[in-house]
Amino acid sequence: YGLVGSEMCIRDRPLSERIAYAPFEKLVVSAEEAAQHVNHGDRVGISGFTGAGYPKGLPTAIAEKAKALHEKGEEFKIDVFSGASTAPDCDGVLAEAEAIRFRSPYNSDPTLRKQFNDGTALYQDIHLSHSGQQVEEGFYGDFQVAIIEAVRITEEGHVVPSSAVGNNLEFIEAADKIIIEIN
């Protein structure tokens, strides 16, 4: 559905070397543009397993969108699913923007933990090995967006995931829209 090329990727190698599949060239957008496809109430599956393999740029863009909408008095909260914990530039920025309504299966961010404890965000603590199966079996309903980190898209269109795959396959199969962040 969309490709996000982060600044990290651009400094390392030209984005054209990372996205070698010609039909995808026209799909490249900024993180801010991609964030416009994530809406209030969406169920969002993100790649990653611990502090690796999660999207780096898009969570900040989604957090900025949430802050702007909150300043206008509009609601913006999403349900976030991953393979495990992420890091401050994912869970942390979304929590600080009060953009998370529900989080599963794991959290290690102190701001988000406070929100769970004060009831402003919901949390489901399940065994990590069950989370993908529950998504696959439809326990949570439809997913609107999957945000997957990758290091490259080959000439044949194969997506090369980064260092932590987590529940990528389950999120891709469950989501209406897929955003691939190239890092």
Each language-model region and where it sits:
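Short glycine- and Lys/Arg-enriched binding-loop motifs that mark or flank ligand-binding interfaces
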Residues: 1, 44, 153
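A broad, low-specificity signal for short, low-complexity segments enriched in glycine/proline
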Residues: 6-7, 105-110, 137-143
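Alpha-helix C-terminal capping/helix-to-coil transition sites in glycosyltransferase folds
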Residues: 4-5, 37-40, 142, 174
